[in-house]
Amino acid sequence: MSYAIRVAVVGASGYAGGEILRLLLGHPAYADDRLTIGTLTAAASSGDTLGEHHPHLTPLAHRVLESTELTVLAGHDVVFLGLPHGHSAALAERLGPETLIIDCGADFRLTDAGAWGRFYESPYAGSWPYGLPELPGGRERLQKARRIAVPGCYPTAILLALLPAMAEGLIEPAVTVFAVSGISGAGRAAKTKLLGSEVIGSARAYNIGGTHRHTAEIIQGLRVVTDRAVTVSFTPVLIPTSRGILAACTARTSSSLSKLRTAYEKAYQVEPFVYLMPEGQLPFTGAVIGSNAAHIAVAVDEAAETFIAISAIDNLVKGTAGAAVQSMNLALGWPEAEGLSVVGVAP
């Protein structure tokens, strides 16, 4: 009998933790006993059953959430961290180097300490391999890794929309992004501005003018494929839906649509989760909900000499939990797409 990988989820009562568990329950490795779901932890929710927070996870609904302590995490092969920013580093440094730790927070995403200091209050903890396999060189860095930083949801949508054009030098490096996100992207903590009466029938811009924390991460990703000085003007907007990100990315260009589409076809033809829409079709969030897919469309406004890329992802799947499971598969040497669907649940 082969050895079963034992998995723990820290922050299991949150949206990211719950979505990781949903994907693990549907993973072939769980079905054929290559993977078992071990300890589930939470902070304020410790002592509750998982079903009190995620009633849809019926096979695990009876499980009791434990306090996040090193003693209950010992002996696990894989630990997913779904903690608030600034809380992962202290826990991660106490887990052994042989443990595969996959952090869904921001603690280890940025490679530049200065960039971290501009956006986060906690001390810089360093960087880990970045869990975006579609980034050039990213897949190789994740294979056999034991520490992985899951990308932010906005950077995932935006980088997938821009990387091929930026890599081929087909657009100017000054990028403007307008992106809308479902409310789950803001987490599960109780906040007045996230109450139903505040968000239903309303859209709200936030952290504009270069103040959103994901801006540094987007620039970092684009600099992987270009030596030019990249700037990103990013405007995020919360919309009254649970899931989904739709990002509209623009930049000046003198390239033809044909040349741009060729670059995207070349970059994504072998990617299992990135789908370049047929010319004339546009992504929408409903088509990717529940899936690990990213739908991309590109266009050129010739009169304005402007390139437009539109991307749609599920912020909780490709934007968080799906990327975490995709990274786990690569790190463990399993098929990358195992347990992950490209089929959404629209309408």
From Swiss-Prot:
Belongs to the NAGSA dehydrogenase family. Type 1 subfamily. It comes from the Bacteria. Its EC number is 1.2.1.38. Pfam families: Semialdhyde_dh, Semialdhyde_dhC_1. The keyword NADP applies. Keywords: Amino-acid biosynthesis, Arginine biosynthesis, Cytoplasm, NADP, Oxidoreductase. It comes from Mycobacterium leprae (strain TN). Catalyzes the NADPH-dependent reduction of N-acetyl-5-glutamyl phosphate to yield N-acetyl-L-glutamate 5-semialdehyde. It catalyses: N-acetyl-L-glutamate 5-semialdehyde + phosphate + NADP(+) = N-acetyl-L-glutamyl 5-phosphate + NADPH + H(+). It is found in: Cytoplasm. This is N-acetyl-gamma-glutamyl-phosphate reductase. The active site is at C153. PANTHER family: N-ACETYL-GAMMA-GLUTAMYL-PHOSPHATE REDUCTASE, CHLOROPLASTIC-RELATED (PTHR32338:SF10), N-ACETYL-GAMMA-GLUTAMYL-PHOSPHATE REDUCTASE, CHLOROPLASTIC-RELATED-RELATED (PTHR32338). One of its GO terms (cellular component) is cytoplasm.
